[in-house]
A protein has these predicted regions:
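Generic alpha-helix initiation/capping and coil-helix boundary signal
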Residues: 23, 79, 116, 136-137
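Structured adenosyl-cofactor binding patch, chiefly the S-adenosyl-L-methionine
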Residues: 31-33, 47-61, 117-157
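Short, charged, surface-exposed secondary-structure boundary motifs
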Residues: 74-76, 95, 136-142
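Active-site/ligand-binding-proximal alpha/beta "capping" segment
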Residues: 85-135
Length: 157
């Protein structure tokens, strides 16, 4: 509840992130981008894994976070107060077509599988990152960083 009562909500929702370095990097980057909370599915790597802690560079102590067994229930509750954008390869629109000045949650899926279809279906909007070359997707932490900083960039101006 504390995470959802913040002013200027900017949430990062993580489903089944497995790599400790990725999770730590997302927390550290989230702090830099002004994320007000990180909510993780029970399938995410342990936040207290030594590699996660090192990767956060202290952000683990400053960014509110929550593990939940009811990830779908939390997303449904979040949708009552903010718009949920899911990074998804099947999205029709690029992330930079949207206004993120209202309360916003960014949903990122597992490094190799992406979001489960039922999780993606809960999002208000599916977004994608434009790609050149033959690259299909970015590293989960890199994609999360890009999207979190777009929210910050729009709100900063």
């Amino acid at each position: 509840d504390m995470i959802l009562r913040k002013k200027d909500i900017h949430l990062l929702l993580l489903e089944d992130i497995q790599d400790p370095g990725n999770l730590g990097t997302m927390l550290r980057t989230g702090e830099g981008a002004g994320v007000t909370g990180v909510i993780m599915s029970k399938g995410c790597v342990d936040l207290y894994n030594p590699k996660v802690i090192r990767s956060t560079m202290g952000a683990i102590y400053r960014v509110p976070f929550l593990y939940t067994e009811d990830f779908y229930g939390i997303i449904t509750k979040i949708k009552e107060i903010c718009k949920v954008y899911a990074a998804h390869l099947k999205a029709k629109q690029y992330y930079d077509k949207y206004n993120y000045k209202a309360p916003t949650a960014i949903l990122i899926g597992n490094e190799s599988r992406g979001l489960k279809e039922e999780t993606a279906a809960l999002a208000d909007i599916l977004i994608k990152i434009p790609m050149l070359g033959k690259v299909e997707s970015l590293n989960a932490a890199v994609a999360a960083a890009l999207l979190m900083y777009e929210v910050y960039r729009q709100r900063r101006n």
